[in-house]
Amino acid sequence: MASSNNDGPIEPEAEPWRITQNDHLEQDLLEEDAESQERVDIPVDDVEKAFSFKKLWAFTGPGFLMSIAYLDPGNIESDLQSGAQAAYKLLWVLLSAHIIGMLLQRMSARLGVVSGKHMAEVAYQFYPRLPRIILWLMIEIAIVCSDMQEVIGTAIAIFLLSKGFVPLYVGVFITILDTFTFLLIDRYGIRKLELIFGFLILTMTVSFGYEFVVVKPPIGEVISGMVVPWCAGCGKGEFMQAISVVGAVIMPHNLYLHSALVKSRRVDRKDRRRVAEANKYFTLESAIALFLSFFINLFVVAVFAHGLYQKTNADVREMCIARHDIPDADIFPNNTEPVEVDIYKGGIYLGCQFGAIAMFIWGIGIFAAGQSSTMTGTYTGQFVMEGFVKIEWPKWKRVLITRAIAITPTLVLTFYSQGVQNLTGMNDFLNCVQMIQLPFALIPIITFTSSRKIMHDFRSSKVFQIFALITSALILSINVYFISDYVFSRLGSEWYIIMVLAPITFAYVLFVLYLALYCLVSCEIIPDTVSIRGFSFNKSYENDAPWLAVDSSAVHDNAGYQ
């Protein structure tokens, strides 16, 4: 019930979408702060020119930072398990996941360019208070889980490179230095940061490319696996692995990150042509970055498909025991079960098969993947916290707290885990948690980019909206199957387990449906006059569109001249 007190504005609970004067002031301060940060200038030349390498270079950066999420240790582990279990048969799934990811990243970049705000900032103004707080918490959980994977990957890489001399918990402590590295590089501007990420991607390309060249997998089978959308002779194990590949590639927090990174370019939003140009070049740059990340992932799949497909633990163990320069040569159990592999065992196998150099180069690649991913995770945490809760802390505080939240549970895990193989097994659980969080990025990005009030004449076309909705529904359905299988296979399906999970599942589904309702209204599939108890669609929020004001002024001037 609305308050009758006239001394102040209506409380947000009464009209949760209402933007008060204080909200406008906060937004103005945020925009002023953003403008004061270093932005990359875009060359001013003929905007009608179809293509310019100079302009592409100016826009290059955000897409490569975004592509790091496709190369994190969780993805690498999913790749090698895919190769060991299904050979080259799931490469088409990997390719499809990258294509879908490209389309989603395109939406994210367009949102940042057109609205001048990133996803968290738009969500803050678009959703009522309680839903946006829940949304923020869900994305923070996704960021923490992702960061845990990167910290674990980096610690394992250090453990592998030192031949076990550096304990895992020390490796985790070493990753804290990422925080200070990030702060140091960030002081010198976004271009320097992008250069460092470019170097790390190059390191991964060389490392995993080296393994590909040494192993020499059959190119014909690799190409066939990419273009033939089928998995002959596959069962439930291969199907679950395919789901894992999709879940590892499409990361929820990455959509929030990309929409913020594109704001590092100085785009004149008063000129429609400049906005369209930015959308074009960011899409092209993202496509190039994800094309490269796909081939890096392909290298990993092919290496382990060629070496470990249809091999048993005993086969690999026998090969490793014969070598004396490889640590943990007896890590593979002496049984005839299909070989089980993770990022640590993968390095041991490469050392056993091709020598210590191959093992060290693999470790360097995993280290680069972990380092780059922890830094992008920190960046994402900063943007999400700023956008959702408007915390005006010094940057070093925000970064330290974001890292501490991720490192603390990882430290506990390393202290109590019995061996490195148990630690790497956490990746499956962390991937599962991130799949649970995926709707809280997928649904909002479709909602925002389909909204006339946010994107105006740059909103997604009806065909693209329908494609995005169908694709997202398919991904979410597959995720539900994977999550339910994962949970019940580990916890069991006894009545008391179901009783505990039922209320949590009900609340989760209810919130997803709430977000989906907003999405359908934005897509104009259902009218904004919909009346459902407890649901009020935001009719008053409208993002600025300075190019429309300029267009209107030009039309008015021309009419006056005539």
Curated annotation (Swiss-Prot):
It is found in: Apical cell membrane; Cytoplasmic vesicle membrane. Induction: Induced by pathogenic bacterium S.aureus. Repressed by high levels of Mn(2+). The keyword Transmembrane applies. Keywords: Cell membrane, Cytoplasmic vesicle, Glycoprotein, Ion transport, Membrane, Transmembrane, Transmembrane helix, Transport. GO terms for cellular component: apical plasma membrane; endosome membrane; plasma membrane. It is a multi-pass membrane protein. Its main location: membrane. Expressed in dopaminergic neurons (at protein level). Expressed predominantly in anterior and posterior intestine, rectal gland cell, H-shaped excretory cell, vulva cells, proximal uterus and spermatheca in adults. Weakly expressed in hyp7 hypodermis, pharyngeal muscles and some anterior sensory, ring and posterior head neurons in adults. Expressed in the anchor cell at the larval stage. It comes from the Eukaryota. The keyword Transmembrane helix applies. Residues 77-83, 162-164, 216-241, 309-347, 420-428, 484-496 are extracellular. Glycans are attached at residues 334, 422. Probable divalent metal ion transporter which regulates Mn(2+) uptake. Belongs to the NRAMP family. This is NRAMP-like transporter smf-1. It comes from Caenorhabditis elegans.
